Amino acid sequence: DWTXWSXLVXAACSVELL
């Protein structure tokens, strides 16, 4: 189930990029 992780992963990626 990546539906719930999609948000967390995206947020984590955005924070790491920033």
Swiss-Prot record:
Q: Give the record's keywords alphabetically.
A: Antibiotic, Antimicrobial, Bacteriocin
Give the source's domain of life in one word: Bacteria
Q: What does this protein do?
A: Bacteriocin, active against the Gram-positive bacteria L.monocytogenes, B.subtilis and other Bacillus, E.cloacae, L.acidophilus, L.lactis, P.acidilactici, S.thermophilus, and several Gram-negative bacteria including S.cholerae, S.flexneri and P.aeruginosa.
| Taxonomic placement | Bacteria, Bacillati, Bacillota, Bacilli, Bacillales
Tell me what this protein is called: Bacteriocin thuricin-S
Q: Name one GO biological process term.
A: killing of cells of another organism
